[in-house]
């Protein structure tokens, strides 16, 4: 098991980042890869959770230990795998998630990708009261301003990778067409819109 990895960020894609350390490039799947854009070619530290399957060894990465803790609590729920948990963690703060679980707000929980009624009910059953020690925000990142449309396209790719449907994202993309934000900012704003 790994706690974290520290190395040079050498690549960013819609689904993962690549961190090079000691001559090896590690593929680390993260909730919002573009939140690392301002750290390209710099030394970074990412908290890890390793998933070992018959056909693959996967690394899931997080900005903070709190973000990792939310992820671990989510994958403890029957019906929630690492990819779905990562999509939930991608929402900028966990206030809505915690409130929905503590208030048994099944409709809110069903707004997350791949979460149906049965899984939402299981989340409430398994996680009620277990997030009390976590802060309201799980991430603390910034990014540099770059060309808007390319950044918007990258954000939409990342949201597709998290499991959102193209039909949902078409409306969101149209809303942001005339704006100039970073991919990270687009993702945060889009997630807030999708959760309403």
From Swiss-Prot:
**Matches recorded under Pfam families:** HHH_5 (PF14520), RuvA_C (PF07499), RuvA_N (PF01330)
Residue ranges of region Domain II?
64-142
The cross-references to CDD domains, in alphabetical order and at most eight, read: UBA_RuvA_C (cd14332)
Q: Name one GO biological process term.
A: DNA repair
Cellular location(s):
Cytoplasm
Citing just one GO molecular function, the answer is: four-way junction helicase activity
**Region Flexible linker, annotated ranges:** 143-146
- Region annotation (Domain III) maps to 147-196
Q: Where is this region: Domain I?
A: 1-63
Q: Which InterPro entries match?
A: DNA_helicase_Holl-junc_RuvA_I, Hlx-hairpin-Hlx_DNA-bd_motif, NA-bd_OB-fold, RuvA, RuvA_2-like, RuvA_C, RuvA_C_sf
Q: GO CC annotation: what is one?
A: Holliday junction resolvase complex
Q: Which domain of life is it from?
A: Bacteria
- Which SMART domains does the entry mention? HhH1
Question: What are the entry keywords?
Answer: Cytoplasm, DNA damage, DNA recombination, DNA repair, DNA-binding
Per the record, the similarity remark reads:
Belongs to the RuvA family.
In the record's own words, the domains note is: Has three domains with a flexible linker between the domains II and III and assumes an 'L' shape. Domain III is highly mobile and contacts RuvB.
Its function, per the record, reads: The RuvA-RuvB-RuvC complex processes Holliday junction (HJ) DNA during genetic recombination and DNA repair, while the RuvA-RuvB complex plays an important role in the rescue of blocked DNA replication forks via replication fork reversal (RFR). RuvA specifically binds to HJ cruciform DNA, conferring on it an open structure. The RuvB hexamer acts as an ATP-dependent pump, pulling dsDNA into and through the RuvAB complex. HJ branch migration allows RuvC to scan DNA until it finds its consensus sequence, where it cleaves and resolves the cruciform DNA.
Summarize the subunit comment: Homotetramer. Forms an RuvA(8)-RuvB(12)-Holliday junction (HJ) complex. HJ DNA is sandwiched between 2 RuvA tetramers; dsDNA enters through RuvA and exits via RuvB. An RuvB hexamer assembles on each DNA strand where it exits the tetramer. Each RuvB hexamer is contacted by two RuvA subunits (via domain III) on 2 adjacent RuvB subunits; this complex drives branch migration. In the full resolvosome a probable DNA-RuvA(4)-RuvB(12)-RuvC(2) complex forms which resolves the HJ.
Task: Kindly provide the name given to this protein in its UniProt entry.
Answer: Holliday junction branch migration complex subunit RuvA
Provide the species name: Streptococcus thermophilus (strain ATCC BAA-491 / LMD-9)
